[in-house]
Amino acid sequence: SGHSHYALTGSFFNPGPYAGYLAMILPICLYHYLRVPEKWRYLCKSLKIEKITATVAGMLILCVLPSTMSRSAWIAAAISCIWVAYMHRDKRKWNILWRRYKKRYILWGAGIFLILLLAAAGMFFLKPDSALGRLFMWKMTCRAIAAHPWGCHTGFACAYGGAQSLYFASGNYAAWEERVAGSPEYAFNEYLEFALTYGIVMCILALFVIFGCLWIGVRLRRYGVCGALISLLVFSFSSYPLHLPAFIVAGICLLLACGIGDVIGKYLILCVCLVVWLGGYTEKWTQEKDACRDWMNARILYRSGAYEAANRAYEKLYPSLRNKGTFLFEYGHSLHKSGRYDESFECLDRARLYSNDP
């Protein structure tokens, strides 16, 4: 575990992203299991190893996923695996069975639908305030999008905070909305957050590219990769995977593997990878990770009242963490306690752009 409050986080800081990453791998395991239809004794050694590896990895993921308590990951894994299994169906056999047992399948379908409804209700009541909180965040994000249809240059936090403050100032809100309201860093819906940050038009264009890659992948029968991408798309509907470098890299690789990489050419992909590497994005992510670790040490000084020492530590971290609202609030408050009021005001004023915490 990478967090003292959670028993299971993998290499992440929270069980949610860890579960989402596992849910993205599960359909690939299922694909490699299903893609070899021959009987076991007729398989060559390499295919046997592939099938065993996919089976073991898939079973281990199925053992871990429930313990993460991530409903978003459960849904993403279920939808993507059902899609992969459906794409491997024998169409001729399915048509014969449908004509022969049509009424029975309709009854089974109705029963499965009722079970899914009960499962959805169970997942809601598992953590009801969490589910209501996300619904409220989506509502506020939609109101912010209506106010900024072409995107908000100040970022998600500033636009969300403004929309939420106006909503509560009107007085027309429910008691549960007041209870679950907070100051989130993310919208827990990558589509809404992207539309708010970059505009509705850019969001539609991005979705057009993604579904174009999926279409190419399906035409090329790359169902495992497409299933993983579908899992990521479903998980993005109620979480924040694109704020984590691991998901960004995985998402780009999946888009290229769907077939767009064959279309645009391997040399162009190599050039893009070199640009990303030369641009220092990997180094930037590493520096930010190290800065966050040092921030935890500086926070000890801040909370113990050693503000001068904390200021020196915060000053070194400022170039790497100047876009994090919580860090700016702490730094500004520490400067205020040290009597450096002008610097404190500048720091807190900048924090308003990156945090909606009142």
Where are these regions (language model features)?
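Interfacial juxtamembrane loops and adjacent helix segments
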Residues: G2-Y6, R143, T154-L196
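Alpha-helical transmembrane segments of multi-pass inner-membrane proteins
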Residues: S1-Y6, G10-N95, W108-A121, L196-V225, ...
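Hydrophobic alpha-helical transmembrane segments in integral membrane proteins
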Residues: A121-L135, L274-S304
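Helix-start (N-cap) detector for alpha-helical repeat units in TPR-like alpha-solenoids
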Residues: A291, G325-T326, P358
